[in-house]
Amino acid sequence: MDSSTAALATASAKLDAVAQQGSSSWIGFFANIILGIISLVYSILYSVLKLTTFSIPSLLYTLFSTSLTVTMNATTLMLIIVLVFSLVSWFVRYRYLNMYSRLPPEPQRKEPDVDLFPDTHPGGSKPGLSNYLDEFLSAIKIFGYLERPVFHELTRSMQTRKLIAGETFNLEEEKGFCMVVDGLVEIFVKSARTGQHPVGESCSIDSDGSDEHEEYQAGNQRYQLLTEVHNGAPMSSLFSIMSLFTEDIKLRHGGDEGGEPTSATETYTSSRYGLGNDFSDQRESTVSVPTTPQLERSSSHGPTLHDGDANPSMGGRVPASIPPMSLDPPLQSRPKRPTTSRHATTSVHPDIIARATVDTTIAIIPASAFRRLIQIYPKYTAHIVHVILSRFQRVTLATAYNYLGLTSEVLHIEKSMIDNATCQLPNFLRGDALTRLKEKFNHERERIGEKDCTKGIALHNSSTGRRRKSTASLRKEAALQAITHGQRPSSVTASPPLQPRESGNKHTSNSGDLLMNIQLSRNGGRRSTSNMDPLTRQSTLLGSLETEVVSPLSQRTSNPFETRRHAHISLNKRETRDEDGLFRESILECMFKAIGLTANGTGAREPDSADASPRLTSYDQIRRGGYSSHNAFGFIDPYGGSVDGDADSITSGGTGPGLPVNPHALAHDMRDEVEIVFFPSGSVLVEQGERNPGLYYVVDGFLDVCMSAADESSGDILKASKNESSLNIGPGNQQGSAGRDRFMDANLGQSSSRKRASNVRRNVALIKPGGLAGYVGSISSHRSFIDVVAKTDVYVGFLPRQSLERIVDRYPIVLLTMAKRLTNLLPKLILHIDFALEWLQVNAGEVIFHGGEESEAIYIVLNGRLRLVEDRQEGGVDVRGEFGQGESIGELEVLTESARSGTLHAIRNTELVKFPRTLFNSLAQEHPNITIKISKIIASRMRKVVDDPSTFVGKEGALKASLNKSSSTLNLRTVAILPVTSGVPVVEFGNRLMGALTQVGTPNGATSLSQSAILNHLGRHAFNKMGKLKLSQYLADLEEKYGLVMYVADTNVNSPWTQTCITQADCILLVGLAEGSPEIGEYERFMLGMKSTARKVLVLLHADRYAEPGLTRSWLRNRMWINGGHHHVQMAFRTQSVPINPTAKRTGPSLKERVQILQAEIQKYTSRKVRHSPFYSPDAPFKGDFHRLARRLCGKSVGLVLGGGGARGLAHIGIIRAMEESGIPIDIVGGTSIGSFVGALYARHADVVPIFGLSKKFAGRMASVWRFALDLTYPSASYTTGHEFNRGIFKTFGKAQIEDFWLEFYCNTTNISKSRQEIHTSGYAWRYVRASMSLAGLLPPLCDEGSMLLDGGYIDNLTVSHMKSLGVDIIFAVDVGSLDDDVPQAYGDTLSGLWAFVNRWNPLSSTPNPPTLAEIQARLAYVSSVDALERAKMTPGCVYMRPPIDEYGTLEFGRFDEIVQVGYKYGLEFLQKLRDEGALPVVEETEAKKALRRTMAPRRASI
């Protein structure tokens, strides 16, 4: 053994040595590898051969040759079969048929939080120099947009003054413009209760003596606190500034100028308020304008001033021979204008003093700065006056008229303005000429009939179309000629001096023919015009541009006006149209004279010299070509322009107050703008609440200035004296039970035009021949406070508003004259109200007040939108309301002196009127009856709260998010259409939506704005600073004129127009392509960067009327800022690969853009894409998606609420079919129980045909006894498992989500975990429909995020209240619930169960059966639902329907066809009955056809 072991060891050692030697070389290494591979292959081949040839055959032989015997009894066999069946059933039941439970989780979308800007000034204003500048700039915002030169001119002589605490400051003596820069100033007004009560016995509103700080006594005179002026607010009122600008403006012009209406105003004011002699004397001195030297000179027409009229302080340096409003040539040497006050002027605000509460710094812009501004920048002076007049109309007059009930005062202003704006036609047009004019209209009246005469008959003017057609080309030609002759100076001294004409000539009847009389009356104006070269006339007057190339007939008409050599032409040799032209021309001259546009007084003050002004001279040198755009109405000059557009906007483009105008030449050249119109007696020329179509001049007949008698029901607020007619209107009573507190009712003229036509009107004033109608409203572009009705057959001259606006823009004297008249005609009360009212301009996101703060003012929205939010206890905020134009906020808190209930912030840039509490207290003490109007507003608001059923469930968490959606959809004034990304056809979308809005009929109409429309309006100011002001004013005017303004963002994402669309929007429609990428687009990023807090709505455009399940959720998942819902809209479109309006480049489009355009064009002809037909197309226009969206924006949506009732709810299908056949659109659907099932089907398909088949299939499943029996389980929570029920609903809806439904849908459930109602608007449809149908006991509650949901009918079986809270106007509510058995019970104090059982089966018993335990539980569950049903029936705008389905049981789904037919027949009969009675609330969707009563659209007379 040892020897063998040794041998093996020796052999192994040898082998190791050999291996070591082999491994030391590469050859040995590779040899070992090869040998190993060969050995492995050999082993594998051997194993395979052995397995196939020996092992497998041996195993098969053994298996087949073996015998197996299995012995099993019947019990074991049955157990095996049951086990296999159970396994298969479990797989089918819980793995195959239970797919609905394995859907990916899609929880309900949470209501997005409201976007709020961070409060940048939580602790008040910050000190320092920057604060000083900010407060100063905010104070002078009242002047509008101030350009740099004007700002410097105003501020270079500004003074500051320190007031210590308690120091008084007499504003009556201060002639400049005062503002508070730092501190607090109280403004007091002299109390009319002087001597009525001893000191300390004041008539206080409160009982706690809080008015002690609101009164101030100086000697025996008591003062009442009017307002408090904080940092950045002006101490002077609007009329303080206007009085400075209009010191030298005459109230009336010409020979018919009478005395100032001092006595009338004084008598009216004294009798109105019982004012003492103190006020009368001050008003007398205020209105007594002839004490001013310049006005004395202007009205006297004499060569010199009276010596006694000169102010001694002026040292006799005022030139006696040069009136400030003269067109005479300037003298060679003119004295320098003194810097001191030129004359003592009584303050516009008497009886007013200021007292500093703390140490205060005030800034004063002296009156001399404003006088200097008039001379240097006359055009901008008129702009400031226009801004002030506009704000006075919108702030003071509108508030006094509609909010305080001061109707008499406002209408007295209208009457006084009518008395001052009169001018008689020349006598030569009063006799035979007027008779011939009437004959022309009489022939036309006989031809067309009396019925069409109410529209008005306009005299035909053949040259109107030719003039308008050639205007643009003539302007270009004149501009080119002006550039060619550019060396001619543009100052007025280039022409010979104009001779002043005799004012009395026009009213003197001279011998001779007609033209002699005309020439004698116009000997001055046309002579100077004829002496000018043609080019001068082209650059001075628009009409001369137009008459250079007109027909010879028109030239022949204008020739007699130039020289006397044509005076011998007889009238009978002229054509009749020349006489019509004379009428038009004379009417225009009278209009010009009445509004202050005369040759002897065309401005506030004549400048020293147009050539000597260093600013004008330097400006003329800067201009290239030397051509100044002095056409009459400031038309856009297509060729001439200034180097500096901003300077051009200030110093040129208009005839300043000191530059002369020839009204005769202007009237001759503009005569084609005038229409001579006949109105029969009773015709309405101007309606209250609408914008004046133009200016009416009464040629013959009488016009009544009226108010609707229906507006007088509120009575006289301030108790006018017995000898004075009551003129108060009270439009608040017309606002209905809804109580929307609009002090500027935009619907007034449109919605109630037919009603007002039939109402009895109360006469306010009479306009006689020579008077003007629509004077104030036309010039100020504000809505009319009055009706103008033809008292007799009347012949009027009509100047359209567009033409009048050009005159006002060109000649500032028109505005200044009206401002002068207003400042001298206003009652004292209106002046004090104007002083206390504060105009605020709030930036987007700025907080007006916080919750819990003291209520110190009422806010009225002039323009913009506000949102009131309330903090949640668990964090975040809830929206309590949104307030648009004309609505007021905070009356209840101010009257009750309670803290603010929430935080108010601006959604966008907003203009507000701040009505301070101190003013309200002052008015209440001086005139206690003035509080009646505000009390009515608060009472109507409280009535709305009581009547609104949603307030009863307002504290429940389910409805907090939607309680105030009604306020978000009501009173929308601006809507922006913003694409998600480039390539979305927003222009086509906007055009279709605009068409739908027109057909739906928005109040006051709607308009659409695009970049091109804005550029056309801005003209040459589109790219300078003045354009910003013009744009903001233009947009504000559009919001007042139209009920809805739509902004279409049709430019690139970074363009200013896109930014404007976002900042101006109350609601932003984000339009995207449903089939496109749901990623956030560049426009959305830009919108988010601007931090807009406007309500945002997503609109998805579909090629087909179908939305894939889950598509909408993919869009909404990343857009938490969508807080206004979403809409699905079908619109055929072609995707654009280039921007909508690509920016034009100087070098032309890039190569890439050209290729894209060519590809798009080629693809239109080469694409072979098969377009599938839409799933469903609406067969009626009222069902169109754009109409549905339009109704939603206008607050005219139609809602359908379907109640629960089991199988009885199948009648909903028939009623929906009847509504479709009756032409009633359905925009929003809500349902409970079976109503949620039928409503969800209709909301998904928006058609009755699909819901019929799907509902019948579901009813068949519910009627199957076997399915019900197989679903039974141990009744621990319910009798069934709910699987069959779930399966039936899931097979109907599949994976569809509520967001994918074509119509807006919601359903309600009862959350028994939190004991409240839940509203579901997102998530899987089948889950929440099933939860809404879960009858307790029959089905188990549905678990949703830890809460158990049951049938929503337990709390509210007819969700009308929630539908109303969504902002729906008309609601059709269908109730199919079972009727409660209210038979009186008398079974005693105890009840035997055995007796009850016997009595139930005893046919001879007359005792009613007592309710069972199940019936008692069911009635207990539906207690709250019964109360909600009664409130729903009383909801305004709700149409309650209950078909006769009481005979059908809750589970009788097998009678499907019968129940549907019952609902269909009932629906047809019910709707037909409403239509026959005229009570069908849905208005036909046709364009509004209104009777044309104005002059531009009547039937013209054939002459």
From Swiss-Prot:
This is Lysophospholipase NTE1. The chain crosses the membrane at residues 26-46, 72-92. A motif (GXGXXG) lies at residues 1204-1209. It comes from Pyricularia oryzae (strain 70-15 / ATCC MYA-4617 / FGSC 8958) (Rice blast fungus). PROSITE patterns: CNMP_BINDING_3, PNPLA, UPF0028. It catalyses: a 1-acyl-sn-glycero-3-phosphocholine + H2O = sn-glycerol 3-phosphocholine + a fatty acid + H(+). Signal peptide: none annotated. A nucleoside 3',5'-cyclic phosphate 1 binds at residues 658-777. It comes from the Eukaryota. SMART domains: cNMP (SM00100). Its main location: endoplasmic reticulum. Keywords: Endoplasmic reticulum, Hydrolase, Lipid degradation, Lipid metabolism, Membrane, Repeat, Transmembrane, Transmembrane helix. Intracellular phospholipase B that catalyzes the double deacylation of phosphatidylcholine (PC) to glycerophosphocholine (GroPCho). Plays an important role in membrane lipid homeostasis. Responsible for the rapid PC turnover in response to inositol, elevated temperatures, or when choline is present in the growth medium. Inhibited by organophosphorus esters. The keyword Transmembrane applies. Belongs to the NTE family. GO terms for cellular component: endoplasmic reticulum membrane. A motif (DGA/G) lies at residues 1351-1353. Its EC number is 3.1.1.5. A nucleoside 3',5'-cyclic phosphate 2 binds at residues 821-941.
